[in-house]
Amino acid sequence: MRLHVIPSPFYAANGLVLVPSGAGTALVVDPSAGIQHLIREVLQTEGVSVGAVLLTHGHPDHVWDAAEVSTWGLDGTTVPVYLPGPDMYRMDAPASFLPMSPPDFVGEWVKPTDLREMPAESVELTLGVWIRMVPAPGHTEGSAVFLGHSPLDIRVNNQSFYANEE
């Protein structure tokens, strides 16, 4: 599995794209504002579509482009967007939780159409990506730790930093 780390200019959040070998789909995690084009580049380079979107918590810098990215499923289908339950209310108006106005490059907020509560048990969010959520409230009410098991090749700006060939 390859893990692409995509730094965002929106409060320095990181978006992630997890691409399991041979699956044809990817899991996009925390698609922040200002990185849509970079997420799309990774998807095109890998030859995959979006299988699901995971939001680790409900802060705006982690959720902003989830609605758009969720429409990049196979043949333009809309895929589920998962978020820990306690943060669901934040999706109605995430900008209201910012201490200041969002940066100029941040577009208008659009709530995802297929927003789902992240299950507490281990689930396969997209083919080949099994994730288990462990609640860890503090940063937000819905903050969580997400556990998975897979050999990883970690990439930043398409450069490999760590490869585990297990």
Identify the role of each PLM range.
Residues M1-E46, V145-E166:
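Conserved beta-strand hairpin/beta-sheet module of binuclear metal-dependent hydrolase folds
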Residues R2, N14, T25, V79, ...:
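A generic secondary-structure signal marking the coil-to-beta-strand transition
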Residues I6-S8, L115, V134-P137:
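Short Gly/Pro-enriched turn/cap motifs at secondary-structure boundaries
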Residues F10, W109, G138-H139:
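Short Pro/Gly-enriched coil loops immediately N-terminal to beta-strands
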Residues V17, S122-I154:
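Core dinuclear metal-dependent hydrolase active-site scaffold
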Residues L27, L54, V134-P135:
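Residue in the alpha/beta-hydrolase core beta-strand immediately N-terminal to the catalytic nucleophile
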